[in-house]
């Protein structure tokens, strides 16, 4: 598997969770002998929702909610077979979405 690259994208609502998962991935990849670039923080997506509190009148009474989606990007250069096996066996937190691409 030489001259290849594994690109890993992480998404989560909690920044502490995504940082912990990223450090676990980096530690696992380095332990198996691969080079790691990252984690690179990507822009945080913020979605804001405004909801009327009152069902009838009082248009000025509103609540605002916000969801932040944090993203990280990592490249694992020259992965070995041990690296791929270790990454597949890695148990990450439930709140982290992981996308893996082989190039």
Curated annotation (Swiss-Prot):
Cross-referenced PROSITE patterns: RIBOSOMAL_S10
SMART domains linked: Ribosomal_S10 (SM01403)
UniProt superkingdom: Bacteria
SUPFAM superfamilies: Ribosomal protein S10 (SSF54999)
Keywords in alphabetical order: Ribonucleoprotein, Ribosomal protein
GO-annotated biological processes: translation
Molecular-function GO terms, alphabetical: structural constituent of ribosome; tRNA binding
GO cellular component: ribonucleoprotein complex; ribosome
Presence of keyword Signal: no
Subunit (UniProt): Part of the 30S ribosomal subunit.
Database matches in HAMAP family: Ribosomal_uS10
Protein's name according to its UniProt entry: Small ribosomal subunit protein uS10
The species this protein was found in: Thioalkalivibrio sulfidiphilus (strain HL-EbGR7)
Lineage: Bacteria, Pseudomonadati, Pseudomonadota, Gammaproteobacteria, Chromatiales
